[in-house]
Amino acid sequence: CVLNLMDHEPTTNREDECAIVEHAFSEDYVHVEIPERNGKTVAVIGAGPAGLVAANQLNHKGYKVTVFEARENAGGLLRYGIPNFKLNKSIIDRRLRLLEEEGIEFRYNQQIDVTKLPEGFDAYVVSTGTPTARDLKIPGRELKGVYFALELLSQQNRILAGMEFSKDELVNCKGKDVLVIGGGDTGSDCIG
C-alpha cells in the first residue's frame, strides 16, 4: 500500500477484501444469477483458478459451460498446492456450489487428451495448468526420498480432505532429517 511510503501504516487490503466477502456471504448479499442462455456450449478443460474464472465469465455471457477436471475436485493449485492454514478449502467449496447453482456442470476424474477433445461443444478452453515441476539437474536428484514441493503439498491437502495413501505412495517426513531447497512461500509451506 502506498500509505507506507508516507510514514503511515499500510492498509491491509487482502484482509479488508476478505472481510467484505465474508460479510456479503453472511448477510446473504450473494445470490445465484442464472443468465439468459445464448444456445452455445463451451467445454473448459481444467478446473484450476484459470478454468474456474473462464467458466464463470463464459457462464455469465450466456454459454452453457461444462468443466472437465482430471482430479477428484476442482480448485487446482488453490486446493492442492496451498496448505489449509493459508486457505480454508471451504471457501473454494462455497464458490463451487455457487457456480453449480448458476448452471455450470462439473465432471471430475476426467483425463482429457487435448488431441481428442470431447465432442458436442461449440468451443473449448484449455486451462490445464502445469503439472510438471521444473526439475533440478543436481547430483542425487534421482534418489529415493527426493520430492517436488507440489508432490508433498498436494498429498498433504488430500490427506486432510480424507484421502488415504498406501505406504509406498505416502510422502512421510516424520522422524527424518529434511532439507528444503528454496526459502520462498512454497518452501515455507512445505515446512509448515
Placement of each model-derived feature along the sequence:
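Local cysteine-cluster metal-coordination motifs and their immediate loop/turn environment
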Residues: V2-M6
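N-terminal juxtadomain amphipathic helix
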Residues: D7-V21
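Residues forming the flavin
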Residues: E17-G192
